[in-house]
């Protein structure tokens, strides 16, 4: 393992976050810490993961898309952010692409993603 990868692995271990195994096409619920004045609360953001970038490194991120009041809303989250309280996989999607940007142009039934029924988690 080279020096940079070793430093990144140490930083990720230091954060001590339990990140579930998810990929593009999965419906996920992200608990994001929001600070309003002096109060802090957790706001849930649920939608379809349309992309993951950066692998599992410290700078990795993922994009979640949802439809809110008839408008498509996308949000990019850093995977190892301290503001992320929790990531929960709601539903596994069956897709053949790593990036689902084509969903931006689709509405209604054509934007549906089939559910994956035979999911096997990665063994470490």
Curated annotation (Swiss-Prot):
Family statement drawn from the similarity comment of this UniProt entry? Belongs to the bacterial ribosomal protein bL19 family.
Q: What does this protein do?
A: This protein is located at the 30S-50S ribosomal subunit interface and may play a role in the structure and function of the aminoacyl-tRNA binding site.
What is a GO molecular function of this protein? Answer: structural constituent of ribosome
- What domain of life is recorded for the organism? Bacteria
> What SUPFAM superfamilies has UniProt attached to this entry?
Translation proteins SH3-like domain
The entry's keywords: Ribonucleoprotein, Ribosomal protein
Q: Which GO terms describe its cellular component?
A: cytosolic large ribosomal subunit
Taxonomy, top ranks, is: Bacteria, Pseudomonadati, Pseudomonadota, Alphaproteobacteria, Rhodobacterales
Official protein name in the record: Large ribosomal subunit protein bL19
Is Ribosomal protein set as a keyword in this record? yes
**InterPro entries for this protein:** Ribosomal_bL19, Ribosomal_bL19_CS, Ribosomal_bL19_sf, Translation_prot_SH3-like_sf
> One GO BP annotation here?
translation
């Amino acid at each position: 393992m080279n020096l940079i990868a070793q430093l990144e692995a140490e930083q990720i271990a230091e954060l001590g976050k339990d990140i579930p195994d998810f990929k593009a096409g999965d419906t996920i619920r992200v608990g994001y810490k929001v600070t309003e004045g002096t109060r802090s609360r957790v706001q849930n953001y649920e939608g379809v993961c349309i992309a993951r970038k950066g692998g599992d490194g410290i700078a990795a991120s993922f994009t979640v898309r949802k439809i809110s009041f008839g408008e498509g809303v996308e949000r990019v989250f850093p995977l190892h952010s301290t503001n992320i309280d929790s990531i929960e996989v709601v539903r596994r999607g069956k897709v053949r692409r790593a990036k689902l940007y084509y969903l931006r142009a689709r509405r209604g039934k054509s934007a549906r993603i089939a559910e994956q029924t035979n999911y096997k988690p990665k063994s470490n």
